[in-house]
From Swiss-Prot:
Post-translational events: Phosphorylated at multiple serine residues.
Domain remark in the UniProt entry: The jas motif (82-103) lacks the canonical degron LPIARR that strongly interacts with COI1 in the presence of JA-Ile in other TIFY/JAZ proteins. Contains 1 EAR motif required for the interaction with TPL.
Presence of keyword rRNA-binding: no
Lineage of the species this protein comes from: Eukaryota, Viridiplantae, Streptophyta, Embryophyta, Tracheophyta
Name by which UniProt lists this protein: Protein JAZ13
Species this protein is from: Arabidopsis thaliana
Length: 125
C-alpha cells in the first residue's frame, strides 16, 4: 500500500464532493482501495463523508477506544461510606453512655419500701 495516506482528513461531503470523487477514481485505478460514503451522527449532527476503507476502520477503532475510556470513567468507585462510619461511631457512643447510665442507676430508699406494698395492693383489685 505505497502511497496510501492514513491521515484522516474529514470534511463534509457537500463541500468537497468533487475533489473526493476525483481522488477515489484515481485510487480505484491504481489499487483495490475503494471509496465509500459514510453517514456519521456525532455530537447531535449528521454528516456525510466519502472515505476509503482504511480511514473508516481507523475511525471505528478510535471511536471504540473513546467509548471504552468513557465507560471506565463512568464506573462508580465504591469507597467506604463516610456516613456509615459516622453512624457506627454514633451507635457505639450511645451504647457506652447507656451502659454507664444503667450502672449508675440506683433505687432510692423511699421508693423500694413504700411502693412495693402499694403496687401489690393495686393488683389485687
Amino acid at each position: 500500500m505505497k502511497g496510501c495516506s492514513l491521515d484522516l482528513h474529514l470534511s463534509p461531503m457537500a463541500s468537497t464532493l468533487q475533489s473526493c470523487h476525483q481522488d477515489s477514481t484515481v485510487n480505484d485505478r491504481s489499487s483495490t482501495i475503494r471509496s465509500k460514503e459514510i453517514n456519521a451522527f456525532y455530537s447531535g449532527r449528521l454528516s456525510e463523508y466519502d472515505l476509503v476503507e482504511i480511514q473508516m476502520r481507523a475511525i471505528i477503532e478510535m471511536a471504540s477506544k473513546d467509548r471504552e475510556v468513557t465507560a471506565l470513567e463512568l464506573v462508580p468507585v465504591r469507597l467506604e461510606s463516610p456516613l456509615g462510619c459516622s453512624v457506627k461511631r454514633s451507635v457505639k457512643r450511645f451504647l457506652e453512655k447507656r451502659k454507664k447510665r444503667s450502672k449508675s442507676f440506683t433505687l432510692t430508699p423511699n421508693y423500694t419500701s413504700s411502693t412495693s406494698s402499694s403496687s401489690s395492693s393495686l393488683h389485687n383489685f
